[in-house]
Amino acid sequence: MNTTVAKRINFQNEYKAKHSDKPIMLFRDMDFYFTYNEDAEPVGHILGASGKVAHAEDFTYAAFSARKLDEYIPAIIRKGYHVAICDGAIC
């Protein structure tokens, strides 16, 4: 696992430990949003063929184009999830 992914997963775990609503975490990386581990499967299911779910050696992730954020956030929320977006240097 590369250090960026490890930092994001760490941040995700810490954030979820502090927030009882356990939001789906979306991390911006250039032109894509990524989500990891337990968040990847529901996001992939909600987005269907538009979302990519992949299994790396030691983590699972889903990704989608940043251009689709305004379309996908409501779809995720309609399924009953909360969403937190990390779009900056701390991520």
What are the residue ranges of the model-derived segments?
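Basic, polar low-complexity surface loops/patches
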Residues: 1-91
